[in-house]
């Protein structure tokens, strides 16, 4: 007689929303689509996706949200309060679509000053976009502690002097997806584009979590 391992009844899966801390019902559509859902449908409805498409220096860009009070509050909680658990809630609903849309692309995240990353224990841009489960090339680094909100528009245009690219050959011939959390004047993204162009990538596209209103896109 062949011995068989006795069947054990697995305990029901319980996911808790990382925003309201309520149980995510197993019967919800989101729970059925995502085994490890981290945000409930009720909380996600407070986010208002726009999928706005525009160009930056001739390259295709898209922001998922406007930089409204909801995004501002949750980003502050992530960055300012070091709540790394919130990183997954922004893109979870869209990750299957975005992975398909940017199939074959390698993510290059916008940098933050390394001392800030050390203080909070993570880079917030990397945490947000890591939920896409796409290869990430961390080749651009910020070498000066500078707060862009304190700069004039003209000063922001010189932001490229505060960044360097290391091991740029990693992006040669690759399809590159530049990502950032907030697009205001676009100075950081534009500087990244100019740095990346020098290494002759196959393609460049830009994906932004959010974008402020009524500002020039070019």
Regions found by a protein language model. Give the residues of each.
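Glycine-rich phosphate/pyrophosphate-handling loop used in enzymes and phosphotransfer proteins
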Residues: 1-218
């Amino acid at each position: 007689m062949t011995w068989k391992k006795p069947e054990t009844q697995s305990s029901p899966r319980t996911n808790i929303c990382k925003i309201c801390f309520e149980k995510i019902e197993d019967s919800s559509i989101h729970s059925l689509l995502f085994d490890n859902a981290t945000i409930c449908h009720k909380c996600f409805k407070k986010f208002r996706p726009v999928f706005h498409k525009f160009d930056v220096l001739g390259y295709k860009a898209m922001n998922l949200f406007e930089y409204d009070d909801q995004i501002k509050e949750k980003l502050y909680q992530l960055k300012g309060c070091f709540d790394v658990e919130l990183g997954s809630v922004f893109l979870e609903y869209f990750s299957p679509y975005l992975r398909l849309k940017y199939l074959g692309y390698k993510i290059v995240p916008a940098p933050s000053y390394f001392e800030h990353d050390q203080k909070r224990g993570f880079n917030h841009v990397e945490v947000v976009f890591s939920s896409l489960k796409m290869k990430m090339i961390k080749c651009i680094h910020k070498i000066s502690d500078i707060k862009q909100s304190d700069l004039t528009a003209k000063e922001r245009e010189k932001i490229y002097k505060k960044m360097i690219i290391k091991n740029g050959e990693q992006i040669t011939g690759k399809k590159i997806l530049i990502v950032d959390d907030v697009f205001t004047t676009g100075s950081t993204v534009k500087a990244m584009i100019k740095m990346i162009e020098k290494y002759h990538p196959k393609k460049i596209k830009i994906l932004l979590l959010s974008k402020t209103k009524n500002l020039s896109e070019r």
